[in-house]
């Protein structure tokens, strides 16, 4: 119900990186994002602005669509929960729950947070001066109203069994342990409708009940695969689906969602991965604190690839991270401008000056099996394992270890000195360097796609020869392959 911030950008960048990785590996991959537009929180925010909810969410969704464009993410679908196709999915989902005897009508009495759009048991709240609040200090109110309930308590044992048999279902392990502990403490049936507001999808055959916003929101995943008429292709996608979420909505995705899917006899997604939060110089980002970090500001000032690189490289996926402009500038200057940018600039400029904009020599078996190139060719195996296991920063660490090896190689070989006395040896050195840069350009495409494209353009690599299939010595560059002029890739900034 507000402008997108760095946390929204972070989730999108993670998903986009993973999708680009699988595309480069030759897989068919789909990336879904969207906006959750119903509920009391949205209704109140619209009222406060003096506009109708539908006008309010139209404006909000445009901000998120524009963010996706600014981030240049490869999403295949953007689902708004106010769309007719989504309403159809939600109603079908609800009717299946009813048909399977998973829903009943009763009275709800308990604590509710408008901000979190969530019901809370007393054990989940903090009590200060006779006032209950959520752990992060949010207000809760005691409500009493008629409500439909989902028989969540019936699924406690089956959830625990599933977690045990599928240890990779919830990641990272700290979040898995958190969920298991919560479920073991006991689950109560879940209130899944409200009568105190009107902005939402109505319960079928009911005039006054609105479907709980989190059932509405979660089923957007099913809207993406055209539930309930799911074709074979979408069934394969669902079987391998990864839900990438912020840790604040883990309970809904790792407890309510699998229980709801089990209740309609529908398979569960492959993985629920909960990433951490970003703070701003040690302080939690919030609207009231006025310390929101605007992605578009960072993109316009420093560049899109710089933002993507920092967010992925700076922290382990799943942990919290702290943002400061100083640490941002230090990271991109050190890694992108110094290590990577300077390597490419000095290698290509020197080669083009002394070898007429052409790849100097044919790489024979001895050169291809040189220590530096073997290190480069072998890099991709562990890199792929890291990404498949959501260890994105570790994958980048491995790439930068290789980049540093290549920088050490150029300093050791000193082509600027050997060109005066041994042009053949210099040609070999430069050819090893340029082939290493080709590998770097290919392997960085999921993380910094615009810069990686420029690197491969400088090397004049055909657009059809940039997938991971070509990260192999049999596709090494050939003698006299034309090279383009080097261009600035990463400007330096003052901290």
Label every model-predicted segment.
Residues 38, 291, 375-379, 436:
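N-terminal alpha-helical segment
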Residues 1-33, 85-89, 135-353, 395-399:
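Structured secondary-structure scaffolds
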Residues 17, 55-66, 92, 339-346, ...:
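A non-catalytic, amphipathic alpha-helix used as a structural packing/dimerization or gating element
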Residues 30, 34, 50, 85, ...:
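Basic, alpha-helical terminal appendages of large translation-related enzymes
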Residues 250, 311-314, 318, 327, ...:
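Active-site-proximal binding-pocket segments
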Residues 65-68, 94, 98, 341, ...:
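Structural signal for well-ordered, non-membrane alpha-helices
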Residues 111-116, 276-278, 327, 362-367, ...:
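A glycine-rich phosphate-binding loop feature that marks nucleotide/adenosyl-phosphate handling sites
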Residues 1-162, 166-168:
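N-terminal, positively charged nucleic-acid-binding surface of large information/translation enzymes
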